[in-house]
Amino acid sequence: MEFTKLKTSLECLGYTVSEFNDAEEATKYLANQLSDRTIGIGGSVTVEEMKLYDALVSHNDVYWHMRLPENMSAMEVRKRANQSEFYISSVNGIAETGEIINIDNTGNRVSAISFGHDKVYLIIGENKVASSYEEALGRARNIAAPLNAKRLGVKTPCAIKGDKCYDCKSPQRICRNFSVLWEKPTGSEYEVILIHEKLGY
């Protein structure tokens, strides 16, 4: 997949964009960029597949609720992640026109992406890219969300059937927060990491 159109759109919207051939190359880049920092990470299968946490934790103070220390709860780790200097997240969908879409449960990830850090890194594999905003939204709701629900073991219609969002009212529903970055938010640096590999959901 060519990232030419997406990269141009993102740069016009104010983002710094870096492009990598594979996850290993991107992981090495981020590990070299970040040293002696506090780093928060949002829930992300992409980050897990990249083994990025392991590459960062030896020389940074990293908070990720998918790797809990023994003395901290998931909620405490999420709060510390949201107060960190740097934040790393993947996305649920992105349009070639530059709109970045995320769907969240507790809201820690969508809030952290939007505000509060010196810099935010958004990691995007080629499978997350759609041609339009409408298609990116459909991808986030009907592909990413059902796969995440299934991964988390919840008993929602999308997790059971695995085909689409049912806009359910289940108490286990994970789609409770929604965000779109129309452009780069003011007040923080943002770098989009584009990877020529299929990563995450």
Q: Residue ranges of each PLM-predicted region?
A:
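Conserved phosphate- and dinucleotide-binding cores of soluble alpha/beta proteins
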Residues: 82-201
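N-terminal active-site beta-alpha-beta segment that forms phosphate/nucleotide-binding
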Residues: 2-79, 83-88
